[in-house]
């Protein structure tokens, strides 16, 4: 597989996409959504092969859940594409403008990034999410999914490229690296003549490899330990609801709860309520102070070194008792709080201190960490959740897939 030729084709496609009308891009997206549902049987059959091979390879239940497609999830993916159609196209919009003293009208206008390379693991829905958002913003994309999703992705890419042809857009607008060879990933990371941005979606190892080997700007996202701190002023009953939702709704998601921090003044009462709710569902990994309050809760073990640095992605939850909001914040600073973190409190002082001190991409007061999601934020599906500070942060929707150019208009103006 010649990635240089793929890069050349992608750059050419990006040139044409940059001037495609919103109507033409939306037409392609509408066809993708319809074809996903029309080809559901074929797509689900391919996904079943991936699931079977995953089980044979000993993948965890959490990974298999990420891999799984069913009719409900496929319909949801199609509807996410339709939602992207309904969103405003940012390309060509003016960010701001001003009139200069010399008579020039100067503005910043949104433009596509160009070619986006995305490397991701066992989530076939990512293939559609990325293709849809890149198409809407006039970007070409080169995708490389994990070997665990090979058969699913092959069928999904067929749907995408068929839709592109029907909408009279370049088929190379969305390309897929079919071979699982890691050497091809290394080659992709060096295609700086053709690719403008790399987005890795996966674990810490993938992010580290991309940062260390890429000659292309890399957006780091997805990985991070998510925390909830239950303050002494919190409504304990409602806090139990939020903690349960953050942990149990979809534990394999990157915004699911990893570590629970509880103020010592309410730890005994709160953990008693929480353990009743989580019994039979979640394994607690407790520090010494929390352990002393968990007598009688069967599914628990002592926390060891590294546990509070673990993104569980499963029905496991770290628990620690802290003295106050300051200790909670200090713990989070040490243990990679960069994704989604929340405080349960009725204290304005505590909430503002938490918001201003915690360095995460998304910070919540009295809300679940599960809200860090493009659709939940009204952005449509996202290509990633960025946990860095440049070029984008948090869920990356349409605007985050654009750059801008300066546009100056004048009456044959010359510089004096």
Swiss-Prot record:
Disulfide bonds: none annotated. It is found in: Cytoplasm. Pfam families: Aldedh. Its EC number is 1.2.1.41. SUPFAM superfamilies: ALDH-like (SSF53720). It comes from the Bacteria. It catalyses: L-glutamate 5-semialdehyde + phosphate + NADP(+) = L-glutamyl 5-phosphate + NADPH + H(+). The keyword Cytoplasm applies. GO terms for cellular component: cytoplasm. InterPro entries: Ald_DH/histidinol_DH, Ald_DH_C, Ald_DH_N, Aldehyde_DH_dom, G-glutamylP_reductase_CS, Glu-5-SA_DH, GPR_dom. Keywords: Amino-acid biosynthesis, Cytoplasm, NADP, Oxidoreductase, Proline biosynthesis. Pathway: Amino-acid biosynthesis; L-proline biosynthesis; L-glutamate 5-semialdehyde from L-glutamate: step 2/2. NCBIfam families: PRK00197.1, proA. Belongs to the gamma-glutamyl phosphate reductase family. This is Gamma-glutamyl phosphate reductase. The gene is proA.
């Amino acid at each position: 597989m010649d990635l240089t030729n793929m890069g050349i084709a992608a750059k050419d496609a990006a040139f044409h996409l940059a001037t495609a009308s919103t109507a033409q891009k939306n037409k392609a997206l509408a066809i993708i959504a319809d074809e996903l549902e029309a080809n559901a049987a074929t797509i689900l059959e391919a996904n079943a092969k991936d699931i079977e091979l995953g089980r044979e390879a000993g993948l965890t239940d959490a990974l298999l859940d990420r891999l799984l497609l069913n009719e409900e999830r496929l319909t949801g993916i199609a509807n996410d594409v339709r939602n992207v159609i309904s969103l405003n196209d940012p390309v060509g919009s003016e960010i701001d403008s001003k009139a200069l003293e010399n008579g020039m009208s100067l503005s910043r206008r949104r433009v596509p990034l160009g070619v986006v390379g995305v490397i991701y693991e066992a989530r076939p829905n990512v293939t559609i999410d990325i293709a849809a958002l890149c198409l809407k913003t006039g970007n070409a994309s080169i995708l490389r999914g994990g070997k665990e999703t090979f058969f699913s992705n092959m069928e999904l890419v067929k749907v995408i490229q068929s839709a592109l042809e029907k909408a009279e857009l370049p088929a190379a607008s969305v390309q897929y690296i079919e071979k699982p060879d890691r050497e091809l990933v290394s080659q992709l990371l060096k295609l700086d003549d053709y690719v403008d941005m790399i987005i890795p979606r996966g674990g810490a190892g993938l992010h580290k490899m991309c940062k260390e080997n890429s000659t292309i700007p890399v957006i780091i996202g997805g990985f991070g330990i998510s925390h909830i701190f239950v303050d002494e002023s919190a409504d304990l009953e409602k806090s139990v609801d939020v903690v349960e939702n953050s942990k149990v709704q979809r534990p394999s998601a990157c915004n699911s709860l990893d570590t629970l921090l509880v103020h010592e003044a309410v730890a005994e009462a709160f953990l008693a309520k929480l353990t009743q709710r989580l019994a039979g569902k979640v394994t607690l990994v407790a520090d010494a102070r929390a352990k002393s309050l968990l007598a009688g809760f069967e599914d628990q073990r002592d926390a060891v070194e590294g546990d509070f640095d673990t993104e569980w992605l499963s029905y496991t939850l770290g628990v620690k008792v802290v003295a106050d909001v300051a200790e909670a914040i200090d713990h989070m600073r040490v243990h990679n709080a960069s994704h989604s973190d929340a405080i349960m409190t009725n204290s304005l002082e505590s909430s503002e201190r938490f918001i201003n001190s915690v360095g995460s991409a998304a910070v919540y007061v009295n809300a679940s960490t599960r809200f860090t999601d493009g659709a939940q934020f009204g952005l449509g599906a996202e290509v990633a959740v960025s946990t860095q500070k440049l070029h984008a942060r948090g869920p990356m929707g349409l605007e985050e897939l654009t750059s801008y150019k300066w546009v100056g208009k004048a009456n044959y103006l010359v510089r004096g």
